[in-house]
Amino acid sequence: MREALILLAFAGYTLAQPAPHGYIGAGGCASSNCHGGTTASPVGESRILGNEFAHWSVSDKHARAYQALTEPRGKRMAEVLGIADATHDKRCTICHIAGSPEKTRSDGVACEACHGPAEHWLGLHTRQNSHEVSVRAGMIDTKNLEIRAKTCLACHLGVPGQEVDHELIAAGHPDLAFELDTFTAAQPAHHRPLPNAVRQRAWAVGQAVGLAESMRLLQSHAGKSSPEFSDLECYQCHHDLRSESWRIQRGYAGRKPGTLQVNAARIEMVRALLAVLAREDRATLDSAVAHLNSATTVAAAKAIEHIADSLAARVQKQDIDAAAVLRAVAGNIQRIADDGVNAAEQATMTLDALGTNTEATAPLYDYLEHPSLYRPSEFVALFQKAAAKQ
């Protein structure tokens, strides 16, 4: 399920497209004495692997983002949406062909989608101690976890005017699930292995930035004649209306049955993080969340955005007590499970990212492959079993 979940997300929008000028294309990075080698350089010999281009072209799903537009699913989506050619429609290409100049558009999401148009920093970044000057010349500073997360989320979640909205999902686009550390590892990573502390910070920053960005999207949709359903938990509507439904058995504490529920997946993970790092902000978050599905949604979303932005800046600079965060998630797993499949996905990826036994999460990923069969009690039992093996 882990691979399936990530494949679905990569089949959809991927990474944000910066300014349309200055791209050189992936081939410009493929020199054998730069990033185009066939084997990784020994540790200590170079700060880079040297075979990043091969990693991307052979194993990275980003390299097949253009291809997704030409396959049966992509063609059928274009037909349903009334798009003549998805490979030339900005709604699709803004993310599926990010980082590729026109002449190499079939490369899909290439190096410069993540690292920035390289025209002015390609030569600079080969020199020692050149990172800061390269960033000033247009390189995206992926060492900065907030910037890295925002770069990914611009397409793996969306920003105003560039998003997978309900129309696209209804036409066949997969819903987007994203967690920074899990997706970085599955890309696959084309850098030296990172210390656990850095990976844990990546998870924390990714959760905080993801929540802030989702709240900005929610605010951008306010005031429209109808809600943007992609802001919501999908399966509150897309489920069987059977009398024995777990939703009916659970009840609707604090809201009327049928009230639309904002997707709370990242809220629950940030709750767990605040329980460990900033308890004083936890109460503020809970108060704002209580008003997300009311007439004061915009003000509540703004308050949550502020909390999440502050948290992202804070956790980028400090180590995370991963075990304590996992205890906070596990202690609240019933409520997380009751929030639905999207929240369960984030809890699973959190256990994968912060735990010590990745294999133990496999049954959780397998279970979430079939969201129509999802039952909170079953997910809770599987999560507790996997958590006990960490």
Question: Model-flagged regions — what are they?
Answer:
Residues 331-342, 347-390:
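A cross-kingdom marker for long, charged
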Residues 1-7:
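Sec-dependent signal peptide recognition
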Residues 22-30, 88, 107, 145-149, ...:
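Short metal-coordination and nucleic-acid-contact micro-motifs, chiefly zinc-binding Cys/His arrays
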Residues 27-35, 93, 112, 153, ...:
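Cys/His/Pro-rich metal-binding microdomains
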Residues 38-79, 113, 117-336, 372-381:
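Primarily the internal scaffold of c-type cytochrome electron-transfer domains
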Residues 77-113, 129:
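Post-signal peptide N-terminal segment of secreted/secretory-pathway proteins
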Residues 18-37, 224-233:
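Local sequence-structure signature of Cys/Sec-based thiol-disulfide redox active-site neighborhoods
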Residues 11-14:
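N-terminal signal peptide c-region/cleavage motif recognized by signal peptidases
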